[in-house]
UniProtKB/Swiss-Prot annotation:
Spans through the membrane: none
Disulfide bridge partners, by residue number: none
Protein name according to UniProt: Probable transcriptional regulatory protein Mpop_0922
Pfam families: TACO1_YebC_N, Transcrip_reg
InterPro entries in the cross-refs: Integrase-like_N (IPR017856), TACO1_YebC-like_2nd/3rd_dom (IPR048300), TACO1_YebC_N (IPR049083), Transcrip_reg_TACO1-like (IPR002876), Transcrip_reg_TACO1-like_dom3 (IPR026564), YebC-like (IPR029072)
Keyword Nuclease: no
GO molecular function, one term: DNA binding
Major localization listed first in the record, in broad terms: cytoplasm
Length: 248
């Protein structure tokens, strides 16, 4: 689930990977095609396409699949997908933003609404929770590309707003309008990032108890299982004990 590092282990736990693997490549391919259609098929000139290709590589998507997805956009032989944002609430009053790409708005709306309802959540009007999030750019590098001080200095010089460095790597956050320049400057200095793109970042997170946390995890999984859903962003935090338990 994009935008929430706590879920890295949970969403990749044993069994979960096999359950979603068949859908991962199709979703990645769809994003590549959409990005190439909206911009240029040259990733060096299209930040969104570059981000989509990096995400595909991170999931070990074959090069042929990536090239095929780009050609679908160039050849104009693919479906025309509409990008839609849904907003809603989960157990405990948690807020969620869902990004989808669809060729059938009515079908997707019905599927997303059903996913919320069956898991104890509720779909809300557009704008109901978006004000709790900021649209920001994120660029992430491996820990060994630089030490924390060097990365911080470079990121600030490039115009970034925040840098978090730990054993897992460096995550740089910047304003949406500055994303292109910041990512370009950092890539020129440190090379290709592990991931990059625009996300919805919660302004504040709410703590939930473990029982509510498990319900929210199930809600997110059900929503992400929808074929048209690309990303889910949340504003809740889980206890370390629950993260360890659910990631087992």
């Amino acid at each position: 689930m994009a935008g929430h590092s706590q879920f890295k282990n949970i969403m990749h736990r044993k069994g979960r990977v096999d359950a979603v693997r068949s859908k991962v490549f199709s979703k990645l391919a769809r994003e590549i095609t959409v990005a190439a259609k909206l911009g240029t098929p040259d990733p060096s000139m299209n930040p969104r396409l570059r981000a989509a290709i990096l995400a595909a590589r991170a999931e070990n998507m074959p090069k042929d699949n990536i090239e095929r997805a780009i050609k679908k956009a160039v050849g104009n032989d693919g479906e025309n997908y509409e990008e839609i944002r849904y907003e809603g609430y989960g157990p405990g009053g948690a807020a969620l933003i869902v990004e989808a790409q669809t060729d059938n708005r009515n079908r997707t709306a019905s599927d997303v609404r059903s996913a919320f309802t069956k898991s104890g959540g509720s779909l809300a009007e557009t704008g109901a929770v978006a004000f709790m999030f900021d649209r920001v750019g994120v660029i992430a590098f491996a820990a060994d590309v630089a030490d924390a001080d060097t990365m911080l200095e470079a990121a600030i010089e490039a115009g970034a707003d925040d840098v978090r460095s730990d054993a897992d790597g460096h995550e740089i956050t910047c304003a949406q309008d500055a994303y292109g320049e910041v990512s370009k400057a950092l890539e020129a200095r440190f090379g290709e990032p592990r991931r990059t793109g625009l996300i919805w970042k919660a302004q504040n997170t709410i703590d939930v108890d473990d029982e509510t946390g498990e319900k929210l995890i199930r809600l997110v999984e059900v929503i992400e299982d929808q074929d048209d859903v690309q990303n889910v962003y949340v504003n809740f935090a889980l206890s370390d004990a629950l993260v360890e338990k659910m990631g087992a």
